[in-house]
Amino acid sequence: MLVYVRGAGDIATGVAARLVRAGVSVVMADIAVPTCIRRTISFCEAIRLGEVEVEGIRARLAQTPAEALQITQTGDVAVVVDPQAKMLDELKPAAVVDAILAKRNLGTTRDMAPAVIAVGPGFTAPVDCDAVVETMRGHFLGRVITQGSPQPNTGVPGIIAGYGRERVIHSPAAGVFWSDRAIGDIVSAGDVIGYAGDTPMCTQIDGCLRGLLANGVQVTEGFKCADVDPRGDASYINYISDKATSVGGGVLEALAMLTDVFRG
């Protein structure tokens, strides 16, 4: 079975990892210049680097649908630049998963594939998808919804070790992002972690820099550029998060509900 995942950031990567480990072939699509910050555990880095490995699963960049299918036949994840999902006609996946996490629907419709699964707010099942998976941290994280919508976006990041909004760093100005920091660095409150042009941006808390935008990305004021983990454990940068794993499990459950992937 082939599944086409829209988005290839950290949550989408958690989805893809669970699918691949369950024996499902995966093609992931993202924009030409991805803007994810948790790059050490995001398959979209294959667009920038050519290939990347996360938790033992390799993802490789493909230029065409045919090349993408060849890559999936090796057991690897294929990553394509296809923000408008134009490759669907050639790929003919059994299911489409929208894991862009844009907090709104960027064009996913129920007729894209026999099964269409969405992730996070901005979708209503069964209106624009067959099922949608909850992404808000808390009691309902990872649950499959077949009638209705997930909880609305609050604009406040999930709480980790007592910190929510403080752990995410947004650009104070428009400009080209650059940093001499690296994901995994231990930082202290007040440290400069990067710049938008000549304007510095600082962390508000102590912790481990677990997310950092790639250098050279054009940002607007308020753009999410970095994420500090207050737990301070640098090893976490190498592992898919608890949230992404839970959401991935929900997508896998929805896929089993909507298709015959696990039926003899």
PLM region spans:
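Well-ordered secondary-structure scaffolds
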Residues: 1-264
